């Protein structure tokens, strides 16, 4: 996998977790 792909996936996961925690 390319570094950019891993970074994009990491950012997406952080955003999802951030919104999930934000609702709680």
Curated annotation (Swiss-Prot):
- UniProt GO cellular component terms: plasma membrane
Q: What is its main location?
A: membrane
Alphabetized, the UniProt keywords read:
Cell inner membrane, Cell membrane, Membrane, Stress response, Transmembrane, Transmembrane helix
- Ranges of the Cytoplasmic topological domain: 1-3
- The record's disulfide annotation reads none
Per the record, membrane topology reads: Single-pass membrane protein
* Organism superkingdom: Bacteria
Q: Where in the cell is it found?
A: Cell inner membrane
Which residue windows are transmembrane per the record? 4-24
Concerning what turns on (or off) its expression, the entry says: Constitutively expressed, induced by thiol oxidant diamide, slightly at 45 degrees and slightly at pH 5.5 Celsius (at protein level).
Recorded protein name is: Uncharacterized protein YoaJ
- State which gene encodes it: yoaJ
């Amino acid at each position: 996998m390319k570094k950019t792909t891993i970074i994009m996936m990491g950012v997406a996961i952080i955003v999802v977790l951030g919104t999930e925690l934000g609702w709680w």
